[in-house]
């Protein structure tokens, strides 16, 4: 597990804890921060399931996974060999977001059931937040640029159309760098408007994208 996971864990836990601290009706004291830490751990479990889904599809395609490394905004599965066809690339890439959207649906159902049963806000609030974060992670990962899953989907489609893997890879990498620049610009905007937490988030995402594109 890459050391950068500590950064995202602290940011996730603090962000949600701060949100709960300001939420009307939520218990005070240590409750917001403890709940934030627990929710952060569940969030990381969701990221791990996202990556395991890639690994599962890879193994079904006859490709072994040496290890999975969690990074600041997801993870990277280290494969024993390169993908052999656009079809396998597409299936492996789309598996992660699909699982993430399924998790969002599960948390959404739990949120509705718990809320209608008048369960404590200590339990209900994290469910709602996990719906939002999984939808965000799923949607973000579908952006068409490396190293995101959407970039691999784009590469698979270009690879199939042109028959040139190197050309398809280059196009997906450039797209990833362009996306990183726009995300970084959004981060600067948030800093200028004194929304520092969002600014940090977006700048970290931009750096992550650009370095790995």
Where are these regions (language model features)?
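Hydrophobic transmembrane alpha-helices and their immediate loop junctions
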Residues: 1-213
């Amino acid at each position: 597990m890459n050391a950068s996971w500590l950064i995202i864990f602290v940011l996730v836990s603090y962000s949600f804890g701060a949100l709960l601290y300001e939420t009307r009706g939520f218990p005070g004291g240590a409750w917001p921060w403890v709940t934030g830490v627990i929710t952060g751990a569940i969030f990381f479990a969701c990221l791990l399931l996202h990556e395991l889904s890639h690994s599962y599809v890879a193994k079904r395609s006859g490709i072994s996974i040496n290890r999975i490394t969690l990074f600041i905004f997801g993870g990277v599965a280290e494969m024993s060999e390169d993908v052999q066809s656009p079809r396998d690339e597409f299936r492996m890439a789309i598996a992660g977001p699909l699982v993430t959207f399924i998790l969002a649906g599960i948390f959404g159902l739990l949120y509705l059931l718990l809320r209608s049963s008048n369960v404590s806000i200590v339990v209900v609030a994290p469910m709602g937040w996990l719906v939002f974060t999984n939808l965000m992670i799923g949607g973000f990962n579908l952006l068409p640029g490396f190293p995101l899953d959407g970039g691999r989907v784009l590469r698979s489609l270009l690879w199939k159309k042109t028959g040139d893997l190197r050309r398809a890879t280059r196009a997906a990498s450039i797209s990833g760098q362009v996306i990183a620049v726009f995300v970084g610009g959004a981060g600067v905007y948030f800093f200028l408007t004194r929304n520092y937490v969002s600014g940090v988030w977006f700048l970290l995402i931009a750096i992550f994208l650009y370095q790995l594109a």
